[in-house]
Amino acid sequence: ARLTALSGLDRAFFCNSGTEAMEAALKFARRYWHTLGERRTRIVALEESFHGRTIGALSMTSDEHYRAPFEPLLGGVTWVPIDNPAALEAAVTADTLAIVAEPIQGEGGVRPLSPAFAAAINQ
């Protein structure tokens, strides 16, 4: 209850790793749209991101170095540059399942999202 009060959210889900968190997020997004009767399949992720080593997490990772040995991965992922709201808006369609973004990227260097780009993601 304290965690949700601090975050402004109504639920929390604990994971052992970032990979588990990404897999859970993917499943939550699919379940959400399924519950609404929609089958959305597209994922928008940020370039130079790394989300883990499971098939789902690797599918959302842009670096071919990590992806190539495990292909074919999940399809339907579009990568956009960090801090480019126009590219983000162009990538999001009626079929978008989720937007995957780290508040602070670590794979491409320690790069926090700008407040304006974070706000664009929330839109």
Task: Please state what every model-predicted region is.
Residues 1-38, 42:
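Glycine-rich loop-to-alpha-helix module at the N-terminal edge of alpha/beta enzyme cores
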Residues 47-105, 109-120:
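PLP-dependent aminotransferase-class I/II
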Residues 123:
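Active-site loop/helix belt of alpha/beta enzymes
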